[in-house]
Amino acid sequence: GNLEYPSGYYQPALGFYQNKKNLTVIKGIKNKAIANNIDKRKINKYIRDRFKPPYEIGDVPDGAYIDGAIANKSIQILDEINTSKPFFLAVGFKRPHLPFVAPRKYWELYDENKIKIAPYQKKSKNAVDIAYHKAGEMQSYKTPEIIYKLNKDGLLELDEKLQKKLIHGYYAATSYIDAQIGKINEKLKEKGLDKNTIIVIWGDHGWHLGDHSLWNKHSNFEQATRSPLIIYDPRINKGYKINTPTEFVDLFPTLSDLANLNIPKNLDGLSLKGQLNGEVT
């Protein structure tokens, strides 16, 4: 269903922004597009091509951004469904993808002056070109103040101040999502479901924050291809950290196994139940 936002707030502009200063700029560009008779189906692209900040510090409640609204919707679903029967709830968050938008309180968890930029920001000796990219995704996030340039190796070169701000934004966005997951977990506890619900937290890729002079994903370095995976089963008393590779295709057979369902024979993935129990390393 449609997401709901707190009283006084509308859907974030361009899907991202709630900061009043940014909203004013976006409105001005939109009015210019209308005055220039831009096709209304292309107005958002017209705006994004001219103004799309890579981060935003919002003096807003959690629910004003889409991820807070998604968390609230998930909590509403848990209140409405019949949880006496088995249920499956998939919750997909946008952050910490770009742009790094989050309420101010999550930015204030970190001191930007103490943030360290990546120590190694150049192309490795004898590295293959295909492993690198120009960080086109990052370059698509623009404001009049931000100037992107490429170094002699064709890699994105950002000044230290902007790098620290982006890393700060990544941290803030990650903490924002952590808090939304916490809210859903609290609802499970409130409904007495925390002791019989399997929870999986995973990301779809890693992220470069200036290392190798790379930003975003889109590389074949482990920094981009490795993603987090946390599986919680309340029946398992001890946690294990697994260092051997797993794959996304392992999730379905793992959940089937943990739910005592038959695992289809035609799957490429493998159940990780043994690893979760500490039986397999």
Residue spans for each PLM region:
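His/Cys-centered metal/cofactor-coordination and adjacent catalytic loops
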Residues: 1
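Active-site region of PLP-dependent enzymes
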Residues: 4
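Short, intrinsically disordered, charge-balanced linker/junction segments flanking boundaries
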Residues: 268-281
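Active-site-proximal cap/lid insertion segments
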Residues: 7-72, 76-196, 200-245, 258-266
